[in-house]
Amino acid sequence: MSTPSSLQALVKKVLATQHISKEHYFILKYCGLWWHGAPIMLSTNENNQLMIKSAIFKDGLDLNLALMKAVQENNYDLIELFTEWGADITSSLITVNTEHTWNFCRELGAKILNEMDIVHIFYKIHRIKTSSNIILCHKLLSNKPLFQNIEGLKIIICCFLEKIPINFILNEITFNEMLTRYWYSMAIQYNLTEAIQYFYQRYSHFKDWRLICGLSFNNVSDLHDHIKKVDMNIDEMMYLACMRDSNFLTIFYCFVLGADINRAMVTAVKKFYTNNLFFCIDLGANAFEESLELAKQKNNDILAELLSFKDYYSSNASLLSLKTTDPEKINALLKNYKSKNIMRYKKLSRK
């Protein structure tokens, strides 16, 4: 049988999912569904993940992250409420800042954190990709001594950053800067506009980081918004766009601006990115001799065979007809893009 406390938590949970008119806000205040001068709301995202929303976290927080914020504020009613709604009370010990709150969380069941607990919590709290969530992750976890010497956490962040063509040496920056760049790059990867602006305004000294991440994560919209504010050679930008396979949007954008598509083709061969290679051919690249020689030097029989059918490949007129840097038009053009040259290769290679 449910206890009065659990029934009360359930009623509050149901109430928090309802649309409540302003004249009935007093009910929410009375029930403790009130945070920073506004109602607390519960919702789920497209992945059916539970989110906390409020006036200052309007696009949603992970429930565990909301708990960590309530702990930082020593808000005991919300600590208890979020725990009853399913937040992991152990995560509260990351942001606890008073002995009284520490004891309160321990009474609710919080366990002493070990390294694996911290890594697990780190993973959980940024599953929800919203501006509110990423910004609060940054605010709550920056300059935390608890995080400084956890090797597993450093490995996770370094592995993520190493996938981006970084313009610095990871071993020469602090862990806190690593973590900040991690959140900043995630904001760009998921095109979280508010979070991008937040990091851009506060970390302008991270030279070209926004541009590098936009190119790397195929975010043509943010690239278009930001490109006039930076000074970078267009071929260098194309090179950065080619550092991941299937980055069609940003490769096309750089191509329209005048980047050398033959150099992009050679880069695709060096990286063994066949999708980028065919896309470059579709855009008119014809550096077949150099590419074939490079493939042979690398003893890459797959690329050598692919390039041997050069006489059967041709550029894609529909791609070449659109000379625009408008992100919406580029997205529409490439939304269902499939290379006809790949289809030709597959037919020829089966003969």
From Swiss-Prot:
GO terms (BP aspect): taxis
Looking up InterPro entries in the UniProt record yields: ASFV_MGF360
What this chain does, per the entry, is described as:
Plays a role in virus cell tropism, and may be required for efficient virus replication in macrophages.
Q: Which family does it belong to?
A: Belongs to the asfivirus MGF 360 family.
UniProt name for this protein = Protein MGF 360-2L
